UniProtKB/Swiss-Prot annotation:
Its EC number is 5.3.3.7. It comes from Pseudomonas sp. Optimum pH is 6.0. Optimum temperature is 37 degrees Celsius. This is Aconitate isomerase.
Amino acid sequence: MFPRLPTLALGALLLASTPLLAAQPVTTLTVLSSGGIMGTIREVAPAYEKATGVKLDIAAAPSMGDTPQAIPNRLARNEPADVVLMVGSALDKLVASGQVAKDSRVDLGQSFIAMAVRQGAPKPDISNMDAFKQTLEKAQSVAYSDSASGVYLSRILFPRMQLDKSFMAKARMIPAEPVGAVVARGEAQLGFQQLSELKAVPGIDIVGLIPDQAQKMTLYSGAMVSKSQHPEAARALLQYLASKDAAKAIEDSGLKPVPAQP
């Protein structure tokens, strides 16, 4: 099992006292992270850097979509990267294309869809499917993401719920920006996104998870980019993120940790 960070930190500090290690250049890993798991990597980064001497250059990048910032589009342009943290189903496509190393893949956390309103606004009832449907139909405006949760809502859940004809006219997909930010500015009354993504946005109140009958779990995973210049360091970071030592950071970010992998 990957050692705990305090142990790593002690070893790193001892090794750092030797002239040989002091002469070594600092390894920097470029980490492309989807918003749903960004809270996790941000939380562990300071201690991980201190313990290992490896610097993490973390960039926000959606798991999918047409924006230039999306991870698949960045890799298609051959932008340098070492590790990707993203929606598992989108990662599967990168594995299939050979852009990430299949044997490096780790599953990290399960995410669920939540609803938010502007801070201080009334919190509508979404405790069951009937109440949820009424809340959607009464809403003045609805926003959802252009990532996995939004695709599911717009293509599967909303049509399945047989909402009134006026609903889709007031619902819109938000590209390249957190849905919570749109809600915080008052540009949408209701916002839907992964709980882990909404938790990071100021100016909103999270009403709660949508009902179980409407819910869809999204798996967040990580892998090493095939063209990584630092494969050993990249694999070590992924091994740590998949260990029980990172479970608290995963949970803090709003995800349900996947059991540590052997």
